[in-house]
Amino acid sequence: MKRLLSYAGLLLLYIVGPAHAQQPLTLDEVIRLALENNASIRNSRLESEAAEKIRIAAATRYFPGISAGGLYFDANRALFELRTPGGDLPVYDGNPANLLHPTAFAYFPGGETSLLGRGQIGYLDIVQPLYAGGRIVNGNRLAALGRDAAADRSSLTRDDIILATSEQYYRLLSLEEKRATLGSYAALLDRLIREVGDALDAGLILRNDLLKVRLKRSEVRLDSSRLEHGRKLAAMALCQQIGIPRDSTLVLAGGWSTAAPPQRLYVEPESVLKSRKEYALLEKGVRAARLQREMKRGELLPQAGIGARTMVVKLDEGPRRTLGIFYGSLSIPLSDWIGGSAELEERRLREKIAENELQNSAELLLLQIEQAWQELSDGWTRIQLCEQAILQAEENLRVNEASFHSGLTALSELLEAQALLQKGRDEWTDARSEYMVKQCRYLQATGRSGDLH
């Protein structure tokens, strides 16, 4: 009985598992899974958190620095040793005349005194920087800039993943559309085989015509097999992209989203340039180079601060004593001015390089936007041409079918008309898929990644 229940449980898992795996996924769901499970997204989040920790650490430089320490020593010999020999000491008897020639003496025993043979010292320091050449302020600005740059890089990673996921989604969707088109073509050939077979039985056509149709049907079976293999690979690639177990039976839902005409999406390239994350990162690079130059300049300026120290000291057999010290400090790096001036000039040149990179990259970004627009426009034109070609192919097939049934057209012309229609539908599917991808690329190029899905 237990074994029977075990087999029943395994059978239930076998039935339920594929049903769950084949749950249709929409584009929004696919993108959501990719953003949740992609390793690059997780790493970009960690980088943002690390940059925030650096900013928090930099903010602590505004507060006093506190340090504590202690020292214990026990020497085999004291640092200072004082020996006093014994002897007779004159005693004053009250008569001034006897000062030079004492008549009474007292014995003084000799002795030894040791200092710093053993000791305990503990201290607590508090130092508040008053002026550090602007390095604390600029260091905090640089850390905040690094945090913002990490956020921009995270957004770029997110946009790239959305784009790559959308491309794979539309690639799989186009293969499913082609599979449906090929299935319709195969059904059309099957119907034609039956009609040609009936005509052959009636002696209206030659057997060669039936062989031609069957040969075409075999070609369609081969194409269908190749297409199915490609669809399985595309499905598994999409599963890997969105972080779920590989499943060649993955099913998509929602179909094609609305393809907006390119004119509805157009924006002036200059108006959206600064909304690009790449441009924002380049601007931050210029600001970072400027702050690094200021940081180097601060190293050449005087440093000032105040501090307090409390000490607890116990030396040898003496009592424990507590001392307090307040002090101020001023440091002027005189010897660093010569070499530091050259390093400061190097930082200035780095800043100029960053400015040149910003200008050059801005021009490249504008060119990228223009190229994305041209590709989008060409993609829309291709869709229109494919739709016209399908209408013409459908009309051509209708005419050839009527002529074939009337005995006015050869079978080869009918087969060619059917193949042209199937080819036109495949080209329309490719054009639609490519246009949706180009639409995503144009939205990303114009800084509108939020509209990708």
Annotate the PLM regions.
Residues S67, N76-F80, T84-P90, E427-H453:
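Acidic, low-complexity, intrinsically disordered peripheral segments
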Residues L124-Q128, L238, G328-I332, A431:
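Residues on the lipid-exposed face of transmembrane beta-strands in outer-membrane beta-barrel proteins
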Residues G119-I121, E167, K212, Q303, ...:
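Transmembrane beta-barrel architecture of outer-membrane proteins
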